[in-house]
C-alpha cells in the first residue's frame, strides 16, 4: 500500500498560535500536546515510512516561508514538497509572493482558507490569485465545510465554488478538510465540474459519510484524494482507517495515491 499525504504540518510548535487554533486543539481534537509540537526530519520520515506515505505536502506561508519547513525539502526533495498559504487580502503582494515561492521552491499547491480571512472564495481579492494559479499551472485548495475552530463557517459553503469553477474552467480546484455538512452539495459540484476535487484532510476516514464512500466507488473514483493534516490527525491513524474503508478493487490506491499524483504532480509540469 502506498500513499501521498496532501496536507502535513511540521512546525506547529514554533508557528504562531492564534486563539482559535489553541481552542480547536484543546476543545475539538483534544490533543493539544500532540498538535503543538515541532516534528524533526527523522521523526517525520519514520512516521511516513510506517504509514506507507511516499510523499508529504508540507504547509508554509507564501509571504513568510518557514526555513524549518524548507529544510525538509532541501534535505529530502524526493519525499517532501510544499503547499503555500496565500492571504488574498494582501493584493498584489500575495500574487507576487505566490509567484516567487513557486519559482524558488518545490511548491505544488496553493491554499486559501476562507474562515481565516473572513471572506468567501468569491471575494474580488481572490480572483487575481486564481488567475495566477492558472498561469503557473498550480492547483489551489480552498477549505470547505464548517471549520472546527470557533470562526465563521458561512464562507466555507461549497456553493461558493460553483461560481469559481464556472469562471475559471482551467483552474484545478480542491476542496480541503472535507465538506461537512454539505457532502451532497460537494459531490454534486464535482459531478458538474471536471476541474473540482476534494481532499479529506482533518477528517478521519472512519467518519466518512455513506454518500462519500458511494461516490468514491462510482463516479468519483478520480476525484477524492487522501490527506491527514498531521499532526492534527495522526497520519498513521488516517492511513490505517483508509485501508479499512469498504472500497472496490483499485479505488483505495486511487484515493491514497494516484489521484494526488495525477492532479498535483503532472508529468508535464
Where on the chain are the PLM-derived regions?
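A structural motif corresponding to the C-terminal end of an alpha-helix
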Residues: 47-54, 76, 136, 167-171
Amino acid at each position: 500500500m502506498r500513499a501521498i499525504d496532501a496536507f502535513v504540518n511540521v512546525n506547529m510548535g514554533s508557528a504562531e498560535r492564534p486563539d482559535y487554533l489553541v481552542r480547536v486543539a484543546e476543545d475539538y481534537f483534544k490533543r493539544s500536546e500532540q498538535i503543538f509540537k515541532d516534528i524533526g526530519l527523522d521523526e517525520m520520515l519514520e512516521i511516513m515510512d510506517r504509514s506507507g506515505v511516499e510523499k508529504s505536502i508540507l504547509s508554509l506561508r507564501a509571504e513568510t516561508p518557514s526555513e524549518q519547513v524548507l529544510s525538509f525539502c532541501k534535505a529530502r526533495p524526493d519525499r517532501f514538497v510544499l503547499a503555500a498559504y496565500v492571504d488574498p487580502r494582501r493584493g498584489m503582494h500575495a500574487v507576487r509572493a505566490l509567484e516567487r515561492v513557486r519559482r524558488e521552491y518545490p511548491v505544488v499547491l496553493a491554499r486559501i482558507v476562507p474562515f481565516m480571512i473572513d471572506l468567501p472564495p468569491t471575494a474580488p481579492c481572490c480572483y487575481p490569485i486564481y488567475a495566477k494559479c492558472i498561469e503557473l499551472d498550480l492547483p489551489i485548495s480552498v477549505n470547505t465545510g464548517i471549520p472546527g475552530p470557533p470562526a465563521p463557517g458561512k464562507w466555507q459553503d461549497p456553493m461558493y465554488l460553483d461560481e469559481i469553477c464556472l469562471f475559471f474552467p482551467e483552474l484545478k480546484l480542491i476542496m480541503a478538510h472535507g465538506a461537512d455538512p454539505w457532502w451532497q452539495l460537494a459531490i454534486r459540484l464535482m459531478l458538474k465540474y471536471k476541474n473540482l476535487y476534494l481532499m479529506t484532510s482533518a477528517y478521519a476516514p472512519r467518519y466518512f459519510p455513506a454518500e462519500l464512500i458511494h461516490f468514491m466507488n462510482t463516479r468519483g473514483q478520480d476525484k477524492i484524494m487522501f490527506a491527514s493534516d498531521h499532526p492534527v490527525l495522526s497520519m498513521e491513524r488516517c492511513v490505517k482507517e483508509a485501508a479499512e474503508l469498504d472500497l472496490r478493487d483499485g479505488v483505495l490506491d486511487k484515493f491514497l495515491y494516484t489521484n494526488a499524483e495525477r492532479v498535483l504532480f503532472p508529468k508535464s509540469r
